[in-house]
From Swiss-Prot:
Highest taxon of source: Bacteria
Signal peptide residue numbers: 1-18
GO CC field: cell outer membrane; transporter complex
Protein family (similarity comment): Belongs to the LptD family.
Compartment annotation: Cell outer membrane
Gene encoding the protein: lptD
Annotated protein name in UniProt: LPS-assembly protein LptD
Record-linked InterPro entries: LipoPS_assembly_LptD, LptD, LptD_C, OstA-like_N
UniProt keyword annotations, A-Z: Cell outer membrane, Membrane, Signal
Length: 765
């Protein structure tokens, strides 16, 4: 016999825990409860969701008194279900008791228990002898008593939990009491013991852990390392969730060879579209340096939009000494960074014009000669498409004041204006863009040193420019290595004329020579900045061919180009630094190709056809059979590269190998090795192993790298001896479920070092 009761009473509170979406890796670790899920009836109205439905084999009920249900009792209310052998409902006191093969389920978790006592009037319930499983996750455990309070919280007494599979419990947290706040989505734990491999390793009198991705104040995962530079090192970050729009991370970092190194990061949101970060780092009395100086860093970054038109940007960094990034692991810059950026900018944008004001001060570590400061620079740009008879009009201008910390250095104010007319012609088979520009620049220079007597107090420079750039697109279908391809042939040419004017009376404030890669051949200038505008009468010829497979994916791209100088640049006769008196530029070629489904080749060369010398070569060969498998070989050669620390010319000939490979489903290897062929020495070695299971992850890595040591500018007058190379061992451990999945990942291992995976030929800067 089946009897159904429909009551407008609420049995148990609805827990409001976060519905976390498991990651792809986590989905393979989901632990399902040993009892089947009770399927809710779909399409119920809001009123029906509140009704109680009881189904049983037998029942004995009298109105206003007890109702007794026996035999496969199923109690349902919306998404909540209770199954038991026997249940008693006291209608007078609104007490509901159930026992015998008891199962409680909702959309958050499943609980099996010996007995259940629920007070429907106060929305409280107690389950004894409980085992619980969180749906869609791997969190599960036991509790002597599990209480659901009237304010939607959970209290577990004499309990434990883990994220490991039941047949392989690598770690287990046992606690006297756990309280889970369903609204705040965090838990409090009292008198806890952490067992690893069933061995108690930690006693924790009190701790808090998040039960979702919601931010929560508390300690983050510690890390351990040892190195020849800092000795044994341990850090224990503490996270403070101040407010929804503010948070702070404080990291005490103890180094046995140096002392206590503290790092503080404050992050904030300002309105809907602005954000910023403030970093403070401090090491008092560095024991590794003579004089035990204090070392510090402070950095402020801010960016965002005030409204749809206004933009703001700020970035300011200061450090105590030249070797700060080289000696200490900063959260702001890497060891190879030797420039500190100090920039502030406010911009306003309209459809056809924009204006910005900018201040900039770049500090170069380890160099006595300091760059000029931009204090300030105002830019105004105007553009009008189809201004007249298909002509586009543009106007670019800037007003810059150059200052310097050294009072002996000359200073200057520069006004530059460049109106232009452009005729663009575009079609499916090619394009032709013609442009005329007039560049007017005025300087007002103040000389503070006799070494700059050759400079003029005022300079007015007017230079015309004509630029014609054209490209034609050819296409055909062809067969190569038994594969069908669609091939394009894209010849490109550019004629550039830039007038000449004597510029020896102008100082060098923000100008440097640009690199001559393939795309650089089609620039309209040889220098960054505006202090030198090289005269030109030249033609650039280039060609690009591409091969597309049957899926319209680019399989190969090859580009080749060179500049033909119709006359020597007169600017070279004024200053040997900018000399250009050859008939042609370097011959630049670039290749990117997919050799097969798994092999990829990238190469670039700059060859001087006048002197028959190789000016630059870069080659990378990648083997990527799957998303998580990589083997990369690289080589670069750069002759006569200026070492800014010694002002000497050096040749770079460097080979490298980088790999990332899973040994099995849980163990991953990442390593790299870079070798200096000229000096016959290794400049960086990195080896890392990472093991990750459903419930914990551990990484062990070894790092050996060359150091960039600068002259000391801190502490005593004694120049401290620094090792040319540094080596160290690093250990990271994450226990999943105690605060999230942790920071470990293969991608950051690939980029942990001097050389980036995507740009292995360049030092990170």
């Amino acid at each position: 016999m089946q009897i159904r009761y429909f009551l407008a009473l609420s049995l148990l509170p609805q827990l409001v825990l976060a519905d976390e979406s498991p990651t792809a890796s986590a989905s393979q670790c989901v632990i399902e409860p040993p009892v089947p899920r009770i399927v809710s009836q779909p399409g119920l109205s809001a009123a029906d969701q509140e009704k109680i439905r009881i189904v049983s084999d037998r029942s004995n009920a009298e109105m206003g008194k007890q109702a007794i249900f026996t035999g496969d009792v199923v109690f349902s209310q919306g998404d909540r279900h209770i199954a038991a052998d026997e249940a008693i409902l006291d209608q007078a006191t609104e007490q509901f008791d159930a026992n015998g093969n008891l199962v409680f389920q909702d959309n958050i978790f499943t609980v099996t228990a010996d007995s259940l006592q629920a007070q429907m009037r106060s929305n409280r319930a107690t389950l004894k002898g409980a085992q619980y499983w969180l749906h869609g996750q791997q969190v599960h455990g036991d509790a002597e008593k599990l209480q659901i309070t009237m304010n939607n919280n959970l209290i577990l007494t004499n309990t434990n939990f883990t994220t490991c599979p039941p047949d392989n419990v690598s770690w287990l947290l046992e606690a006297e009491k756990i309280k889970i706040n369903s609204e705040e989505e965090w838990g409090e734990i009292w008198n806890a013991k952490l067992r690893i491999a069933d061995i108690p390793v930690f006693y924790i009198p009190y701790m808090t852990v998040p039960v979702s991705d919601k931010r929560k104040t508390g300690f983050l995962y510690p890390s351990f390392s040892t190195s020849t530079t800092n000795g044994f090192e341990v850090s224990a970050p503490y996270y403070w969730n101040i407010a929804p729009e503010y948070d702070l991370t404080f990291t005490p970092n103890y180094m046995s060879s140096r002392g206590l190194f503290t790092k503080t990061e404050f992050r904030y949101l300002a309105g809907e579209a602005q954000s910023g970060r403030l970093n403070l780092e401090y090491l008092g009395n560095d024991q590794m340096l003579s004089g035990s100086p204090n070392r510090y860093l402070y950095n402020w970054q801010h960016q965002g939009a005030i409204d749809k038109n206004w933009r703001v940007l700020a970035n300011f960094t200061e450090v105590s000494d030249n070797n700060y990034f080289n000696d200490l692991k900063s959260d702001v810059n890497r060891a190879t960074d030797n420039q500190l950026s100090r920039i502030g900018e406010v911009s306003y944008f309209e459809r056809n014009w924009d204006i910005s004001t900018r201040v900039q001060d770049i500090k170069v570590l380890g160099e006595d000669e300091k760059p000029y400061q931009v204090m300030p620079q105002v830019n105004f740009n105007y553009r009008a498409a189809d201004f007249w008879n298909n002509l586009d009009f543009g106007f670019n201008s800037e007003l810059t004041n150059f200052a310097h910390d050294d009072s002996d250095m000359n200073t200057a104010t520069r006004l530059h204006m460049a109106p232009s007319l452009t005729l663009p012609i575009h079609g499916p088979s090619g394009s032709l863009t013609s442009q005329v520009k007039l560049m007017q620049t005025n300087y007002w220079q103040e000389q503070n040193n006799s070494a700059f007597d050759g400079l003029d107090d005022t300079v007015s420079r007017t230079i015309p420019q004509v630029r014609i750039n054209g490209q034609i697109n050819f296409e055909r279908f062809t067969e190569l290595f038994d594969q069908n391809y669609r091939q394009t042939l894209e010849p490109q040419f550019q004629y550039l004329y830039v007038g000449y004017e004597d510029q020896r009376g102008i100082g060098i404030y923000d100008t440097a020579q640009l690199q001559d890669d393939y795309f650089g051949l089609f620039r309209d200038r040889r220098f960054s900045g505006l202090d030198r505008i090289a005269d030109a009468n030249q033609v650039t010829l280039g060609v690009t061919t591409r091969f597309f497979d049957d899926h319209n994916q680019e399989a190969t791209k090859f580009s080749l180009g060179q500049i033909l100088y119709l006359q020597d640049s007169k600017l070279g006769y004024e200053d040997n630094l900018f000399e250009q008196n050859q008939s042609t530029s370097v011959l630049a070629a670039e290749l990117d190709t997919r050799l097969s489904h798994d092999w990829y080749l990238g190469a670039a060369i700059q060859y001087d056809t006048n002197s028959s010398n190789n000016k630059k070569t870069e080659v990378t060969l990648d083997f990527r059979p799957e998303a998580n498998k990589l083997l990369q070989l690289s080589y670069r050669y750069v002759p006569d590269l200026l070492n800014s620390n010694t002002n000497d010319l050096v040749n770079i000939s460097q080979a490298g190998v980088r790999g990332a490979w899973p040994i099995n489903d849980s163990l991953y290897f990442v390593g790299n090795w870079y070798y200096d062929l000229n000096e016959s020495r290794s400049i960086e070695t990195y080896t890392g192993f990472q093991y990750e299971s459903c419930c914990y992850a551990i990484r062990l890595s070894y790092h050996y790298r060359i150091k960039t040591n600068y002259d000391d500018n801190i502490g005593s007058a004694v120049i401290d001896e620094r090792e040319q190379f540094e080596s160290g061992v690093y250990l990271n451990l994450v226990i999943k479920g105690l605060g999230g999945s942790g920071p470990l990942g293969v991608s950051d291992m690939l980029n942990d070092g001097l050389f980036n995976y995507r740009k292995p030929l360049y030092l990170r800067n």
